[in-house]
């Protein structure tokens, strides 16, 4: 029996649930403090926008952490969404390279 997978978690959900809400920081304040339009943060939090390198650098500096953390969240999310969309097609469409004997 195939295990049911949990849906991928958008980085915006992590931003909101693990950073903004516990720290009492509004989306508007974050946007102003990192010098981006408030709409950008709102769209990220609602899963309608990706975290770009620019945004990752700003979030990293604001939260005193690696910008790579934010990019890794985004990359992992995109990989999981794509994997879910492709489902079993990869098995049919991609042939694994076979090692050649010497």
Language-model segments: residues:
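Short alpha-helical "recognition helix" segments of helix-turn-helix
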Residues: 29-31, 59
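Short, basic-rich loop-to-helix N-cap that marks the start of a DNA-contacting helix
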Residues: 48-61
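A short, Lys/Arg-rich alpha-helix, primarily the initiator
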Residues: 1-25, 72
């Amino acid at each position: 029996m195939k295990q049911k997978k949990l849906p991928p978690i958008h980085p915006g959900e992590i931003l909101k649930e693990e950073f903004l809400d516990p720290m009492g920081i509004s989306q508007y304040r974050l946007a102003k403090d990192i010098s981006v339009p408030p709409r950008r943060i709102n769209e990220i939090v609602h899963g309608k926008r990706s975290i770009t390198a620019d945004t990752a650098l700003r979030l990293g500096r604001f939260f005193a952490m690696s910008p790579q953390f934010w990019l890794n969240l985004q990359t992992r999310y995109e990989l999981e969404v794509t994997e879910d969309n492709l489902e079993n097609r990869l098995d049919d469409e991609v042939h694994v390279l076979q090692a050649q004997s010497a």
